[in-house]
């Protein structure tokens, strides 16, 4: 079984899910990605990029507080395809859940 995906892996698959090519640059401490239209894109850190990604892929977001706070990302039809627990970083958790869900969708893209 494969280990945890890196942020770069998640972003590559999320971009694939929406048919976008991205290039990465930076170092081990951080990186940026640029779309084929030369625009910065990182839905893990940018609320607008994350919202556009969820809209394009019809991902619904639920905030739950059962046994701890968590964010769930749902595919069309209501199936949970990603969830991310958080303490007090709801924005980060929401963006991460969206990107994880998009990455799951991207895995199915040929």
Task: Locate predicted features.
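Glycine-rich anion-binding surface patch
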Residues: 1-110
């Amino acid at each position: 079984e494969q280990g945890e995906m890196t942020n770069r892996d998640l972003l590559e698959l999320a971009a694939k899910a929406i048919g976008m090519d991205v290039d990465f640059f930076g170092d081990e401490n951080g990186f940026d990605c640029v779309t084929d239209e030369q625009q910065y894109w990182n839905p893990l850190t940018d609320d607008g990029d994350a919202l556009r990604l969820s809209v394009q892929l019809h991902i619904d977001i639920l905030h739950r507080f059962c046994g701890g706070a968590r964010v769930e990302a749902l595919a069309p039809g209501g199936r949970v395809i990603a969830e991310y627990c958080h303490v007090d970083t709801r924005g980060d958790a929401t963006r991460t859940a969206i990107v994880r869900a998009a990455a799951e969708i991207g895995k199915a893209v040929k």
